[in-house]
Amino acid sequence: MKHKSLLTRVTLPLAVMALAVSMWGWALEGEQRTFVRYVPPSYNGTRPVPLVFEFHGYGSNALVQVFYGNFMSLADRYGFVIVAPNGQGSDRHFNLTGEAGLQDDVAMVGALLEHIEATMCVDQTRVFATGMSDGGAVASVLACRDPDRFAAFGAVAVVVYESGCADTSVPIMAFAGTADPVVPFNGGVVNCCGHPTLPGAPSAVAGWAQHDGCAATPVVDQLSTQVQRRTYAGCTGGGAVVFYVIQGGGHTWPGGLPVPSLGLTTRQINASSTIWSFFAAHPLA
């Protein structure tokens, strides 16, 4: 009976949240695209609220990511709306590299943002992007290509830096595990998804630090046995770069549901609450 009572207390909030999660579709250049939306109970349509875009990993989907990242409890507490687009293709991924036969997903996100802003009461100074794995790449690419409409970015398990980014300094936070079995921490061949080669997370974060005019060497804080924080100080133009290294961590969402096949999920930090605190501190100027 004790265990049953505990289970009820844990699952009831998720059941209530699920009632507020809805799937939507809209036509984009003749193609049907879909997204999941979560609206907190406090939303009344008259007071502008923050908007968090959340992107799923390769082969996953928006609904899974919304529950995996579990920003919903934070949305209830702080009053922001969550929008999670679905990828495309038979393997459900985001097209960031001009793949033939697929829509440009950076353009898709821009169109979806315009749609949400036209149909909801959104604070345009507090629009944010975060994601897991392939979704972390989406958030990173948006930071590079569309920094004037998004205020801050959070990338989990994959963070990338492209050459030729817009000059605008951006606040970006990244998480990566040193024992990631899918995307090597220090770079190399990815163990899925067509096996592309990616630079390591430390290299990508260093690229963002240079882009933002930050100090080349980060301030390192060992927060716990598994969590090291690297903060790049002195950034210019409102930029900020913070990197959480999960020592022994896998291809997982810190503080999220464990996925043993993808390695360690640390319980020593919660990526969602940490990312939201970072977002809340960095609205558009």
Annotate the PLM regions.
Residues 2-13:
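Bacterial N-terminal signal peptides that target proteins for export
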Residues 18-51, 77, 126-154, 158-160, ...:
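A domain-start/cap signature at the N-terminus of enzymes
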Residues 23, 27-128, 132, 138-141, ...:
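Serine-hydrolase catalytic machinery in alpha/beta-hydrolase-like enzymes
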Residues 67-68, 185-191, 200-210, 224-231:
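Short alpha-helix in the alpha/beta-hydrolase fold that links the catalytic acid
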Residues 167-172, 237-241:
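Short, proline-enriched alpha-helix->beta-strand connector loops that line the catalytic pocket
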Residues 174-176, 180:
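Short beta-strand/loop motif that positions the catalytic acidic residue
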Residues 180-183, 251-252:
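Acidic catalytic loop of the alpha/beta-hydrolase fold
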Residues 243-257:
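Active-site-adjacent mobile loop/cap segments within catalytic or ligand-binding domains
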